Amino acid sequence: MIATSLPSPGVIAAAVIGALAIVAALALLIRRRPDAFPLLAVLALPFRLPISTGGRTVNLLIPLYLLIAAGILTRLASRGDSGAADRRRQGRSGERANVSPPWLARLLTPRGLEWLLLGAVVLYGVQALYSADHTKAAENLAFFYIPFGLLFALLRDVQWTRALVLRCLAVAVALAVIFAGIGFIEYYRKSLFLNPKVVAANEYDNYFRVNSLFFDPSIYGRFLALVMIALTTVVLWTRSRRELLIGAGVLAWLMAGMITSFSESSIAALLLGLAVLAAYRWDLLTTVYISGALLAIAAVILLASPASLHFGLKGSGGSANNATSGRTNLVSGGLELFAKRPLEGYGSGSFETEYKRHSDTTAENATSASHTIPVTIAAEQGIPGLAVYLALLLVGFFVLFSGAGRSPPRIALAACFAALVLHTWTYADFLEDPLTWTLLGIGVALARE
């Protein structure tokens, strides 16, 4: 990983002045062209810069932070014109689901989702007070939860049109195509541009994993999977033969890029997203039958495959734990932490510290163990955090899926969110990923249209 330590005060001052100038320029652009904000947000989503301080390296989305600051500045400067935005925000916030009791009907609304997101951030902050790793908790709040919450609010108030949605998708697809191309270069050269940890791991594996300009192959695969799901929506619902052929070609390119990442979690997320699209496009029952048949075939192949294919079920040390890259044992260790302190947990951001302390394991294993989000939340935040997380998933799925049947953009968002949630169950980052807040922000806006 290319890490930079904090520079001299003079350099910091110059950087601050430059950042302020960039924010001012972006704010002026957004003020004149409101549609520029969502387009630039999609453009900035993947780009992280590694900053080293206090003995650890944090990969920060500096371009996205600058854009969010510009968006907030524009919002503050145009408060006198905020009536339309307020009306859009309130448009369907009072519309309730046809369920009982009344409190549940109020919860299953876009406004209910907003309150749950706010509650998740507040609870995380409160539970950071007794965490064994205050620094990690503070970093997550300052660099992820709070700025991404602002991103959610800004995207929620955008006037989304079909043309704007397609332009944002075009930006995401262009990025994915470029990233996949860079990944092909890495695979051909057997050399990565970023992250020496992956380089070191590749020296011991029987295959070479690429991560393009991301700092992790699985996060790279996650991005490709979500873009592919969104693009597949266009392919399935288009009436243009030209769009169909171009989309199919791009999907083949991106699929090849995902394969070079060797991210099983990303492939699983992609398959779930495609299953959701198929259920909407054709028939739910048929989709279930086909999906079940494919899963059965995959299971037979997995069980019958020779050890030389390295699936981990056969050969020396073959087991379910080995097949899941050691995830089974790591998850069980996280559940043991939850069992020891189920009510309040060990505090926000403390999972790796507490896992090392109780399991007497390496920092690398502790980091891997934290890559199953429900287990991490249970261990860190106990029953309260787990309850908020489950409620957030329930309401999020309800808001995104409810009424999405006639709107391809909403179907795409729902499928992408389902895929993202599955990916976080086998890898890291849920509310720490701006993609989560982006999908929910756009989804809430479209649900109120």
Where are the model-predicted features located?
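Alpha-helical transmembrane segments of multi-pass inner-membrane proteins
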Residues: M1, A21-A27, A69, V121-A128, ...
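Juxtamembrane membrane-water interface segments that cap and precede transmembrane helices
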Residues: M1-I2, L49-S52, A200-L213, N329, ...
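Membrane-interface helix-loop-helix junctions at transmembrane boundaries of multi-pass membrane enzymes
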Residues: A27-A36, L73-W115, V234-G249, R281-I290, ...
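Aromatic-anchored transmembrane helix interface
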Residues: P63-Y65, G112-A120, H134-D157, A176
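Transmembrane alpha-helices of multi-pass inner-membrane enzymes
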Residues: L64-L73, L274-A275, T286, I290-G292, ...
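A membrane-periplasm/extracellular boundary helix in multi-pass inner-membrane enzymes
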Residues: L76-R79, G181-K190, M258-T260, A278-T324, ...
